[in-house]
Amino acid sequence: MKSGEPVNSHDVTDEQWEGLAQVVPLRGRDAWPSAVGHRAMPEAETERRRRFVVLRINVFADAREVAETLMAGIPVLLDLTSAEGEVAKRVLDFSTGVVFGLASGMHRVDRNVFLLTPAGTEVNGLMESAAGVPGV
């Protein structure tokens, strides 16, 4: 075998590829994140976690939106201030069941205003937990 000839039919020399395609490195060796300091898109996760929905409930039929939003992993600020007493009680009972079923959290913000949070959501600075709060 002569010098510079391919070893087998699959081996080719640089001269044979010359002019066919330009090879451009995508990143330098030091541009790749290290395993220790790398987190996959932390900004996107943080941005998603900052979002919450305010739902002002007037009729019991609106309670379904509370459940669907919380099931999607989005915190809900449940405002029952404009609902009649019996409707507010039914919606609160329903929402409590949803929170329990999803292992979520419920926090009282004000009279007839509650923050419903998906599991794993940290909440700071609220008045008290909704558990044991007398009345609606």
Curated annotation (Swiss-Prot):
It comes from the Bacteria. It is found in: Cytoplasm. Pfam families: SepF. Disulfide bonds: none annotated. One of its GO terms (cellular component) is cytoplasm. Keywords: Cell cycle, Cell division, Cytoplasm, Septation. PANTHER family: CELL DIVISION PROTEIN SEPF. This is Cell division protein SepF 3. It comes from Streptomyces coelicolor (strain ATCC BAA-471 / A3(2) / M145). The gene is sepF3.
